[in-house]
């Protein structure tokens, strides 16, 4: 039996219900009144397994990426405390990044003979202290920072940020297309060799630019702009990402590795201003379900029956344990995983989150959720009320106290939030109108 290969595709700030296979209420937003914005991902879901209760490790970018790299709660590393790592404070900082000595999914698979590549966004610290090639990837093409212009490839401070390996490079073109092309080329080269490809798109993260919006790129002064974009622009960005995913999947078919490759798609956190999270409430930066419940699609013809939907609760870091389990590779004994393999149908779960932003705390235990925001506490039955509108704290006081106590027990096992941890929230009430 061949060892499986792995492709992990990560979107950036994608909402829970944006894809056709997750509701697709905005079908037609890209200009075709009859179409989903995600035909290739919809097909992937029909050929594999779709999760209804998949979660990101955080409601914001880089913390989730720490968990995806290590298989452990991001709170265990100093860099995971910033929400998120920001270029202006992290460049040259030897504390804010993924330590090269820490084992990662990429390093463990590389040491087991896999070809490894990260095509896309890194956002786990800056050279010279950190980088993909220092953490298990043999190839890297993409930006180091959290967000870049799709045409100029400059970060939020105006610094050019596109790398091939450890060398800064200049390329012409729409970033989503550049990443898709490079990923398809990587897959095509791996005939007969097991590989691990991390394809981490920046789409549909701001700036709000489709393939046709190079003039908009020249107009905006700040890529975190609040004076542009639209629902149509946003869903076109998703559609163009989906087209690239289709090219990568076609390359996989052409190599004959389709049946032996586990392909997973997800998002780093919940959606931003133009996204759809129905029926959930909340968005990026919130520990409400809309900020942390994300699409999970997994296709592995050799391992999963096609066309299934599961309500199994899962979290980003579980995919590290899952990939290692599928590959027959043991985790590093000095760095035990917090995630668990989803190949073994784990059943009811205990999942935990915390954020410095608004002093948020959350625990999902079975079907119940404990939530605290700036000291206000809530209890929700997620099966009956995934929208989190019925606070059952006083109707079920024993359940509430049990979940709060369990959260406190878990938090006591984690490092405290550092006093100097930064929160970089790019939109304020003065620039983006907020609902009450």
State what each model feature region is.
Residues 1-377, 382-405, 409-412, 417-436:
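Formylglycine-dependent sulfatase
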């Amino acid at each position: 039996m061949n060892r499986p290969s792995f492709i992990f595709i990560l979107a950036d700030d994608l909402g829970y219900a944006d894809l056709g296979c997750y509701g697709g209420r905005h079908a037609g937003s890209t200009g075709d009144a009859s179409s989903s914005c995600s035909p290739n991902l919809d097909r992937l879901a029909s050929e594999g397994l779709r999760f209804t209760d998949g979660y990101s490790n955080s409601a914001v970018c880089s913390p989730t990426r720490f968990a995806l790299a290590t298989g452990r709660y991001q709170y265990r590393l100093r860099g995971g405390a910033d929400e998120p790592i920001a270029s202006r404070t992290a460049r040259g900082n030897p504390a804010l990044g993924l330590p090269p000595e820490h084992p990662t999914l990429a390093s463990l698979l590389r040491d087991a003979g896999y070809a490894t590549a990260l095509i896309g966004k890194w956002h786990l610290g800056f050279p010279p202290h950190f980088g993909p090639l220092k953490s298990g990837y043999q190839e890297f093409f993409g930006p180091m920072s959290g967000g870049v212009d799709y045409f100029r490839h400059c970060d939020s401070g105006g610094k050019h940020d596109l790398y091939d390996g450890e060398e800064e490079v200049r390329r012409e073109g729409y970033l989503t297309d550049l990443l898709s092309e490079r990923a398809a080329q990587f897959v095509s080269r791996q005939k007969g060799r097991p590989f691990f490809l991390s394809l981490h798109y920046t789409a549909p993260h701001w700036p709000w630019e489709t393939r046709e919006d190079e003039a908009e790129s020249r107009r905006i002064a700040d890529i975190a702009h609040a004076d542009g974009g639209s629902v149509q622009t946003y869903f076109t960005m998703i559609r163009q990402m989906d087209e690239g995913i289709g090219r990568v999947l076609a390359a996989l078919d052409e190599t004959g590795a389709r049946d032996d490759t586990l392909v997973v798609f997800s998002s780093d956190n919940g959606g931003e201003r133009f996204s759809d999270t129905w029926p959930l409430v909340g968005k990026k930066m919130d520990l409400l379900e809309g900020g942390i419940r994300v699409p999970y699609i997994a296709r592995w013809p050799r391992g999963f029956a096609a066309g299934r939907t599961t309500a199994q609760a899962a979290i980003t870091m579980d995919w590290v344990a899952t990939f290692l389990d599928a590959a027959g590779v043991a985790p590093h004994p000095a760095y035990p995983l917090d995630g668990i393999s989803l190949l073994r149908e784990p059943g009811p779960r205990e999942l935990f989150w915390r954020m410095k932003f608004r002093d948020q705390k959350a625990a999902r235990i079975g079907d119940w959720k404990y939530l605290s925001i700036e000291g206000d506490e809530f209890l929700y039955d997620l099966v009956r009320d995934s929208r989190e509108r019925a606070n059952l704290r006083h109707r079920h006081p024993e359940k509430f106290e049990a979940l709060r106590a369990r959260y406190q027990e878990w938090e006591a096992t984690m490092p405290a939030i550092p006093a100097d941890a930064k929160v970089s929230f790019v939109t304020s009430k003065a620039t983006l109108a907020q609902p009450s």
